[in-house]
């Protein structure tokens, strides 16, 4: 599966690069949002009872694109983080804490080019040995281990 995903990413990069250079200038936030969702989807980790997705995202931008976003970078990052939260909710995924997006300048990128790197920061909850109680029933041990943020839909629109 990874071979196909890598191949798809290479084709996507070639295609997007040609199209971007031919028809437009600069990166638009909507493009970053779409690519963040793909990055999230492509880097799932299947846990014992949940599917985890990355919670840290770094967006590499050309110097020119980075400077265009500079005056509202914090607002844009928050908007992209909220987009990821919505995506996580809609797909029933779990994250170790609130997703964070950081925009960084990468000198070797040309205007309109960008990349995204993601990772999981924190620890996945570990399964624990059950404890036998006085009544002979095995119950999960309360370990006070790492917290997991599971985003649930409240049903409010």
Predicted feature locations:
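Short secondary-structure junction/hinge motifs that connect adjacent elements
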Residues: 24-43, 49-58
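Short glycine-rich, basic-tinged beta-strand/loop micro-motifs
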Residues: 9-20, 48-71
């Amino acid at each position: 599966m990874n071979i196909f995903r890598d191949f798809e990413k290479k084709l996507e990069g070639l295609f997007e690069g040609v199209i971007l250079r031919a028809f437009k200038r600069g990166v638009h936030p909507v493009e970053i949002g779409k690519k963040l969702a793909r990055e999230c989807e492509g880097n799932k980790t299947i846990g014992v009872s949940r599917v985890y997705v990355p919670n840290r995202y770094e967006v590499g931008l050309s110097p020119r694109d980075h400077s265009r976003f500079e005056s509202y970078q914090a607002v844009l990052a928050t908007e992209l983080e909220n987009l990821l939260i919505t995506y996580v909710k809609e797909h029933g995924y779990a994250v170790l804490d609130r997703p964070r997006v950081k925009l960084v300048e990468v000198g070797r990128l040309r205007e309109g080019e960008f990349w995204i790197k993601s990772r999981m920061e924190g620890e996945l909850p570990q399964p624990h040995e059950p404890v036998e109680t006085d009544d002979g029933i095995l119950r999960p041990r309360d370990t006070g281990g790492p917290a997991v943020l599971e985003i649930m839909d409240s049903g409010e629109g």
